[in-house]
Structure formats: C-alpha cells, structure tokens
C-alpha cells in the first residue's frame, strides 16, 4: 500500500466524492482507502478538503468531510482525556463474560462469512472497511460479551491506519461506554452492507435475541457453539514488541541511525509514526530522523507488518531519513 506523495496527490485530485455519502456504508462503496496516510500525518485532511472544495460543489463533498470530522473529534477527546480513553469513559461496560479476545475472532472462525473474510483481509493487508470494524467490535463486545479493550488492542495492532483516538473511542461507542446504548447488527444487516446472502447463522435472528445468541441469560455458552469453537473461548492477545523492533532493525540496517551520517551543527527534524509529513521543512537542510520509541509501542503494540509499512512510507518519501529505535530521552 505504500505510495509516493505525488501519486497520492493525483488520487486526491481525481477523486469523485459525489457517491461517497450514499455508498460509504457498503463494503464496495466509493471509499478512498486514504486513512493509512491521513493517520500517519502523511496526507493532510486540510489539503484534501481544499482540493475537493475547489473542484466539487458542497452537496458532493460535504458527506465526505463530515466523516473526516469524526476523526478530528476523536483526536480532541484524546487530547483532553489522555489515557482515560483506554478506560470506560461515560459508563461502565455491562454484562462482561469474557475478559480476553474471543478465539473465534482471532482465528477468523466465527462462521459469519463476511466477518471471517474481513479478519483475513485485516491480517493480509492491514485494511478494514469501517462498517466491518463496527461489526467486529459489536460481535466481540456485545455478542461474545467480551471486555472491549482486548479487542480494541487486537484490531489496533493490525491496522495500517491505527490511531488510538479513533480506534479506542469507536470501540467504546459500540460497547456503549462512550454512547447511550450498545450497537448491534443482525445477519440481515451484515448481508445488506457486505453483499452476502448468508442465512442460518447465530446472528440470523431478531434483534431482541441477538445478545443471547451465543451466551444465554445465565451467562452460559450455548453447547451447540462448542462443537466448532474452543474451550475456553477467549485467550490473551500479545505482541512481542522487542522482537519486532529487532526485526525492523535487521530488515532496514542501511537506514538505521548512524551519528557519522548526520551533518554536524545542523538542526534535526524528528518524525514518528504519526508525523510522516513529506513537506515538513523541505526547503531546509536538516537531519531527518524517524523515531521509533519502544515505550510507545509497548503501550500501543502493532505488528511487524504495520511497523514496516511506516518505515517504508518514510524511506520512500523523505530523502535521507534515518531510523532511530529507542526512546527520545535515550538519544
């Protein structure tokens, strides 16, 4: 998914936003797939807005920009609340039965074809349509009745567009801890927006029965599900951050920070996984460093595939950049 900045700008200039508002909830809708670049600070939402406003009337671009505004809203909540976004914000999650990640989700073995295919796509590409994120999080939190944070951590780790604010607050919205009620969807809803026709699943029921379709009112897993699913049903999801950072260092040895390759008495521009702006101080002679801090990735782990995407995007678009793996205070 890596791309040059010039090529991405051409996509922005040629994008036709008119169908976005009416089709964005469908998995084959007119979405852009720009979120990895916006989340990395590589593509400016302001630039996108300016381009769309220049070439299209308000009726065409307003729906797109309203969705962009949600990301900005989540950022402002994170800015105000800090790490509290990792806890139930407005109300406590109710009826938690599982404390970790349900294995049918981790193993893409839920039996819901659209969801299982989406999990495979997430693992393979780091991309997941927004509606499928909602389906996955509601299945995890409200149907499997699992604590929302382990699921949010799992999804965050695999997304190329990982963003603590948007990810964790969206999961809280679905779980009902950052909204007035829990979000649920049945099989008919999933079929409609994913262009599938599956029937006979545990979600193929009326809404009033959905939240007891796997775990009943006595908090017991219905025995019919245990034929295809493991017992226990959940497992802790973990990522070995230290090993991943070592692998990144080995794969990108020629770009690893070397003090002898820097210019003395020259300012530094320090980039990170949320600031890969290719236009940042481009008219100045500076030392350019991509900072990958173990402390950050211990708190917000990502997979090696995601981290390599960040490195590749930086190397492709920021001339002369070096990679420093360490915490800022260690430099």
Regions found by a protein language model. Name each.
Residues 187-251:
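Long, charge-rich alpha-helical interaction segments
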Residues 2-5, 12, 17-66, 70, ...:
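Trp/Phe/Arg-rich N-terminal binding region typifying the photolyase-homology
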Residues 138, 153-156, 162-176:
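Metal-dependent DNA replication initiation modules
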Residues 101-122:
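Helix-hairpin-helix/helix-loop-helix acidic hairpins
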Residues 137-143:
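Hydrophobic/aromatic-rich effector regions of fungal transcription factors
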């Amino acid at each position: 998914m890596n791309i040059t900045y010039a090529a991405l700008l051409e996509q922005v200039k040629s994008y036709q936003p008119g169908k976005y508002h009416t089709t964005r909830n469908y998995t084959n809708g007119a979405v852009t797939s720009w979120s990895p670049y916006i989340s990395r600070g590589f593509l400016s939402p302001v630039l996108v807005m300016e381009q769309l406003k220049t070439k299209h009337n308000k009726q065409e671009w307003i729906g797109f920009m309203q969705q962009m505004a949600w990301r900005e809203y989540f950022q402002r909540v994170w800015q105000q609340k800090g790490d509290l976004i990792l806890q139930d914000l407005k109300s406590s999650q109710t009826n938690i039965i599982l404390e970790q990640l349900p294995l049918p989700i981790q193993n893409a073995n839920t039996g819901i074809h659209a969801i299982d295919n989406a999990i495979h796509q997430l693992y393979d590409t780091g991309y997941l349509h927004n509606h499928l994120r909602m389906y996955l999080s509601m299945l995890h939190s409200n149907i499997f009745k699992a604590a929302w944070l382990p699921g949010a951590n799992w999804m965050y780790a695999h997304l190329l567009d990982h963003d603590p604010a948007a990810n964790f607050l969206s999961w809280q919205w679905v779980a009902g801890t950052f909204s007035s009620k829990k979000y649920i969807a049945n099989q008919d809803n999933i079929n409609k927006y994913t262009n599938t026709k599956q029937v006979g699943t545990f979600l193929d029921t009326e809404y009033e029965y959905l939240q007891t379709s796997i775990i009943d009112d006595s908090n017991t897993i219905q025995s019919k599900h245990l034929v295809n699913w493991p017992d226990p049903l959940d497992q802790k999801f973990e990522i070995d951050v230290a090993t991943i950072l070592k692998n990144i260092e080995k794969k990108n040895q020629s770009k690893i920070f070397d003090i002898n390759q820097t210019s003395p008495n020259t300012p530094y521009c320090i980039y990170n996984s949320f600031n890969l702006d290719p236009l940042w101080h481009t008219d100045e002679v500076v030392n350019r460093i991509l900072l990958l801090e173990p402390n950050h990735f211990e708190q917000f782990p990502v997979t090696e595939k995601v981290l390599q995407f960040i490195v590749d995007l930086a190397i492709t678009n920021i001339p002369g950049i070096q990679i420093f793996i360490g915490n800022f205070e260690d430099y």
